[in-house]
Regions:
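The feature marks either
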Residues: 127, 213, 220-225, 229-268, ...
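Solvent-exposed soluble domains appended to multi-pass membrane proteins
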Residues: 256-664
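Residues that form generic nucleotide/phosphate-binding pockets
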Residues: 52, 56, 134, 157, ...
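Generic detection of long, well-ordered alpha-helical segments
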Residues: 15, 43, 84-94, 121, ...
Length: 664
């Protein structure tokens, strides 16, 4: 029977088999070296493998379908003409190289964000120079290029050998009827592989999200298919009808008139400070609440920040809207969540023009300071287009510059240079509002071997059990946070020496949590998927605020309304943020922009409940945060589901409305 099997069919199936084995090899690499399955059952792993293999087979067949159709159409002629031989060899080389590159990018992407490659990754192409440099400084790119050259030679050799071997075999002459049978059967077999299911419904990406453990779900996905499956979720637009319908909900929360859609609230103060206080907002790169020793982390990486928190007003339930530095910078400045599906809102030229509170500090010098270039993610546009007379200090602006990595000068030098600028302004009796963006607590974790009293830990300084319990993925990650902690303390000490400390309101917040493993203290947040959003926010201003802990929920959009209130600086609020120090507001909430089973979604944290729903399919879930089990309790609390659904929908559509209707 095998001898009667057409050579061109053998050629198709052989190549599909080889490519499948090749992709399965990558899946094994991901399983053994990338994924974290310490607390996962064998059954879940088996199920993930089952889905993963089916996704891989689907990709293999789809990848090979164009050449398969050509072979089936030409059958024996395919091995007789040299042009087809060149097409086959070139096709295989390009296919293997392209898939290899994508899979390698996927591994790096997962290490960075704990997520498989998807369409949102296209945002990194908007600043290809920085993204490329980060990759080069973090991964062995040049060694990889040599490996790709070797792969090119190897695939070319194998492709030639296989083609020539099949071509030399005796030709079995078939009738037109049998050729048609083989064509149809092969086509149906390949189609079934793409369909991937014996049920009425084809294999879909959502099936990979079968587990409550996100690591398992991510492992089941195929990066190439996942990229294209998420591509359609990049659409944007305003639904004026829904905005109008749900406006009364957000109007009640913000204290607005319901007569017309307007978010304008004028805030004035009966008394003002004798001397205008300075404001310094420090964005703490990749710092989540879970990493704080103050919150029980056993690594003791933030002993300086922990002490500062005790001397500050600390918001223990503070949430950023969307994980990502660009998203948090945009939200903190504009007072609007970043709900852009494709990239980040900062990159959307149609939405960066906003009426913001930062611009309303009359009589203040306004500054934005960072170690690298302000061109990344169009952040320069967000600041420059909205803040009059803003001065940007970036790489190339400072007196002393020792470039550390792709992010420019490190945090130590950034704080040193910032202190010089603030000291000069203080000496000139010019009040200032400054936004300082740190970066060293970010890959590639370029911490120095010695900086004053700081020294990185080495193997043996911390036992593996403690490192594991702390949730840190690596010693390098831990050292980067310790360096940030050291620099924050050093900066405040310099502020005292320079004379502007007493009259300055310092606000520190994390832009998002970094990728960390599960910890005992924050297991619930890890399981429900909002640990990345929970970050510290504390206002250090001993002259203006007494130290205290605030347990009510606050969100990133509240940053500037809160700070303007502490400074007693009159402002007009056009944003969705509120004063987080308002003790009368007991129904506060956190608004999160999420991915739910691969689909864009939104989440709301309020009164011990966590409500989520997908944007397109409107799939809803409700969880009680204090419960031990992660069980959807929607059926038990229908009134709460209805209330939270209305609030989150109103907030979401109000955000989109303000994107395009809050221009100066």
């Amino acid at each position: 029977m095998n001898k009667q099997f057409p050579n061109y069919i053998k050629y198709i199936l052989s190549n599909i088999g080889f490519l499948f084995v090749y992709l399965f090899f990558f899946r094994l690499i991901f399983f053994f070296f990338i994924a974290n399955f310490e607390s996962v059952s064998i059954e879940e792993i088996q199920t993930a493998f089952s889905y993963g293999i089916r996704f891989d087979l689907k990709l293999v067949i789809l990848s090979y379908f164009p050449l398969s159709l050509l072979i089936l159409s030409t059958n024996y002629l395919f091995f007789k003409k040299k042009v087809f031989r060149k097409i086959a060899i070139t096709y295989h080389i390009l296919l293997y190289l392209l898939l290899t590159i994508v899979y390698l990018i996927d591994i790096g992407y997962y290490n960075y964000l704990f997520s498989r490659l998807d369409a949102s990754s296209l945002r990194f192409l908007s600043n290809l120079k920085i993204s490329s440099q980060l990759v080069v400084e973090t991964y062995p790119v040049y060694k990889g290029l040599f490996a790709l050259i070797f792969l090119f030679v190897f695939i070319r050799f194998i492709s030639i050998k296989l083609f020539d071997k099949i071509a030399r075999k005796d030709v079995i002459f078939l009738s037109k009827k049998m050729k048609a049978v083989y064509f149809i059967c092969t086509f149906l077999l390949l189609s079934f592989g793409v369909y991937g299911s014996i049920t009425h419904y084809p294999l879909r990406w959502s099936e990979a999200f079968f587990s409550k453990n996100n690591s398992v779900n991510q492992f089941a996905l195929n990066p190439v298919l996942n990229f294209f499956d998420t591509y359609n979720f990049r659409k944007d637009g305003v639904n004026n009808e829904l905005t109008k319908a749900y406006f009364p909900i957000i109007a009640d929360y913000l204290g607005l008139s319901k007569d017309s859609i307007s978010f304008k609230r004028e805030v004035t103060f009966d008394s003002i400070h004798k001397q205008k206080p300075n404001l310094v907002i420090v964005m703490l790169e990749s710092l989540g609440t879970v990493a704080l020793g103050h919150e029980g982390n056993v690594a003791n990486a933030t002993k300086n920040i922990d002490q500062i928190i005790k001397e500050s007003t600390y918001f223990e339930n503070f949430y950023v809207h969307k994980p990502g530095t660009a998203a948090s910078v945009f939200s903190s400045i504009t007072g609007l969540p970043d709900i852009d599906t494709k990239e980040t809102a900062s990159r959307n030229l149609r939405v960066i023009d906003q009426k913001i509170i930062f611009d309303q500090f009359d009589g203040y010098e306004k500054l934005y300071l960072l170690g690298g270039s302000a061109n990344w993610a169009n952040i320069r546009g967000v600041f420059k287009s909205n803040i009059k007379n803003l001065k940007i200090y970036e790489e190339g602006s400072y007196e002393v510059e020792n470039r550390a990595d792709v992010w420019g000068i490190d945090d130590y030098d950034l704080f040193n240079e910032s202190d010089k600028i603030f000291k000069n302004l203080h000496s000139s009796k010019k009040p200032f509002v400054a936004y300082v963006q740190t970066a060293t607590n970010h890959r590639p974790f370029s911490v120095p071997q010695n900086k004053e009293s700081y020294k990185p830990l080495v193997e043996g300084d911390i036992d593996k059990t403690t490192l594991k319990e702390s949730g840190f993925i690596s010693l390098a990650q831990l050292n980067a946070l310790r360096y940030l902690d050291f620099n924050v303390k050093t900066f405040l000490n310099k502020a005292k020496e320079s004379g502007y400390y007493d009259n300055t309101i310092f606000a520190f917040f994390g832009d998002h949590n970094t990728s960390m493993n599960e910890t005992e203290s924050f297991k619930k947040e890890f399981d429900l998927g909002f640990q990345l959003h929970h970050v510290p926010f504390f206002i250090h201003a001993p002259k203006y605020l007494k130290p205290k802990k605030i347990s009510t929920i606050a969100k990133l959009a509240d940053l500037f309304p809160t700070l303007a209130t502490v400074a007693k600086s009159d402002y007009t609020n056009f944003t969705l943020g509120s004063n987080a120090l308002d003790t009368l507001k007991t129904n506060s909430f956190g608004f999160l922009y999420l991915k739910i089973k691969g689909e864009p979604g939104i989440g709301l944290i309020q009164n011990n409940f966590y409500f989520t729903k997908t944007i397109q399919n409107n799939f809803k879930s409700l969880y009680k945060i204090s419960d031990k089990d992660n069980i959807d309790v929607s059926n038990m609390y229908p009134d709460i589901v209805s209330s939270m659904d209305s609030l989150i929908t109103s907030y979401y559509h109000s955000t989109k409305y303000l994107y395009y209707n809050n221009k100066k």
